[in-house]
């Protein structure tokens, strides 16, 4: 049983043992708190301490470390085009932003379809591609 409270969809959820556990550990499983109180101006939504969203591993850890909302994370990936990230287990990832019709990155020697973790559609004809890295890439 995940919840001991009668109604988890209330502001007080963040103060329950379950709410605290989710807040502190959800990123390890690919989830983020969707609407953070300090991000209301960015998301347009008030804090919802019960509203967790699956964004995947390693994205949730990266977003949590950098205190990024989903909107900020997507914009960051779009600006950077590619980031490299090592998670708390020592797994290394390359995360790319790709637009339909711009497949240069897929032709690049860096991209390896055998190491593909996932492809997430983030908008019309926009994608985030995540792949594992070998240790040798950083050596």
What positions do the PLM features span?
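Cell-envelope/glycan interface and biosynthesis
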Residues: 1-86, 94-107, 111-138
């Amino acid at each position: 049983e995940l919840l001991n409270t009668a109604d988890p969809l209330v502001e007080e959820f963040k103060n329950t043992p379950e709410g605290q556990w989710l807040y502190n550990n959800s990123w390890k499983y690919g989830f983020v708190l969707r609407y953070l109180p300090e991000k209301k101006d960015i998301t347009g939504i008030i804090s919802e301490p019960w509203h967790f969203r699956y964004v995947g591993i390693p994205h949730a850890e990266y977003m949590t470390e950098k205190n990024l909302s989903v909107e900020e994370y997507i914009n960051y990936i779009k600006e950077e085009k590619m980031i490299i990230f090592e998670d708390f287990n020592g797994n290394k990832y390359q995360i790319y932003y790709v637009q339909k019709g711009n497949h240069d990155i897929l032709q690049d020697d860096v991209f390896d379809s055998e190491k593909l973790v996932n492809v997430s559609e983030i908008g019309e004809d926009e994608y985030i591609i995540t792949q594992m890295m070998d240790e040798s890439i950083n050596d």
